[in-house]
Amino acid sequence: MSLSKCSNVDLKSVAMNANTVRLEPSLGEYPTLRRDLVECSCSVLTLSMVKRMGKMTNTVWLFGNPKNPLHQLEPGLEQLLDMYYKDMRCYSQRELSALRWPSGKPSVWFLQAAHMFFSIKNSWAMETGRENWRGLFHRITKGQKYLFEGDMILDSLEAIEKRRLRLGLPEILITGLSPILDVALLQIESLARLRGMSLNHHLFTSPSLRKPLLDCWDFFIPVRKKKTDGSYSVLDEDDEPGVLHGYPHLMAHYLNRCPFHNLIRFDEELRTAALNTIWGRDWPAIGDLPKEV
């Protein structure tokens, strides 16, 4: 709870009855006024899962929970962090504008921290106090002052979850329980959208795809753009060189042809799942498939 909301709070009473938020690994427990906290068990993989129960987690992992499979970085995510690990001077003015969230000012702190802690796997700066964890949550909450540090931590998680929902990213990518990595990926999503692309891979559910399209950072899903008549289409072929500058031409060509169509054509399991009528009454049945497919 921020200072503006708790000016009349009896601090002595709160100190005796407050719940605590645990910051891992071994960074202490901090009081909070919230009463809806729940122990984050191994079966709880995302913040969204906790919130669907009407609760809030009491444990936050700065460097990811080693028991959470969604926090195990695959090569594709590490390549993403390596790609976007740059100095502020390397970004254009348009890109800096996309990096205003969460602090309100352009910053690459989270991108660099995620690269250090998750790609290089060097966490000594935070563990030894060289980097203060409070500064991390201070940035996410835009400098808001709190009486209790536990409230600052939980409000930061709420801000991350709100941003995830706004950008439409799946909870298996932004778990909400690993703030440094979550914010870095949300910033990468903002930068990717400047090129008309997205990290969103929730359509790709076939088990034959390993963490779909994230085995290589080049595989983004192209965002459709709105036409003057109100319909949507993928990026025009003429726009490819400008929008996908820096990407291999053949890969850019493949991406702009909407990879889902190619996958569903050749992956029988994915095609069966996509055409299952449980998704909606007007969903096409398998028997309605064109002969050429």
Curated annotation (Swiss-Prot):
Region annotation Interaction with host TNIP2: where it falls in the sequence: 148-220
Function, as annotated: Sequesters host STAT2 into viral inclusion bodies. Impairs IFN-stimulated phosphorylation and nuclear translocation of host STAT2, thereby suppressing type-I IFN antiviral signaling. Sequesters host TRIM25, RIGI, TBK1/IKK complex components (TBK1, IKBKE/IKKE, and IRF3) and IRF7 into viral inclusion bodies, thereby inhibiting the IFN responses. Inhibits TRIM25-mediated ubiquitination of the RIGI. The sequestration of IKBKE/IKKE, and IRF3 occurs via the interaction with TBK1. Sequestration and inhibition of host TBK1 probably participates to the cytokine storm induced by the virus.
Protein name: Non-structural protein NS-S
Gene Ontology cellular-component annotations: host cell cytoplasmic vesicle
Annotated organism of origin: SFTS phlebovirus (isolate SFTSV/Human/China/HB29/2010) (Severe fever with thrombocytopenia virus)
Record key words, sorted: Host cytoplasm, Host cytoplasmic vesicle, Host G2/M cell cycle arrest by virus, Host-virus interaction, Inhibition of host innate immune response by virus, Inhibition of host interferon signaling pathway by virus, Inhibition of host RIG-I by virus, Inhibition of host RLR pathway by virus, Inhibition of host STAT2 by virus, Inhibition of host TBK1 by virus, Inhibition of host TLR pathway by virus, Interferon antiviral system evasion, Modulation of host cell cycle by virus, Viral immunoevasion
Start and end residues of each stretch annotated as Essential for inhibition of IFN-beta activation and interaction with host TBK1: 21-29
Residues flagged as site, Essential for suppression of TBK1/IRF3-mediated IFN response: 21, 23
Keyword Cell membrane: no
One record GO biological process: symbiont-mediated arrest of host cell cycle during G2/M transition
Outcome following mutation: residue 102 to A: Complete loss of ability to induce TPL2 signaling and IL-10 production and drastically reduced pathogenesis. Complete loss of formation of NSs-induced inclusion bodies and secretion of IFN-beta. Stronger interaction with host ABIN2
Subunit structure, interactors included: Interacts with the host E3 ubiquitin ligase TRIM25; this interaction sequesters TRIM25 in NSs-induced cytoplasmic inclusion bodies. Interacts with the host E3 ubiquitin ligase RIGI; this interaction sequesters RIGI in NSs-induced cytoplasmic inclusion bodies. Interacts with the host E3 ubiquitin ligase TBK1 (via N-terminus); this interaction sequesters TBK1 in NSs-induced cytoplasmic inclusion bodies and inhibits TBK1 phosphorylation. NSs does not interact with IKBKE/IKKE or IRF3. Interacts with host IRF7; this interaction sequesters IRF7 in NSs-induced cytoplasmic inclusion bodies.
Positions of the UniProt region annotated as Involved in inclusion bodies formation: 66-69
Localisation: Host cytoplasm; Host cytoplasmic vesicle
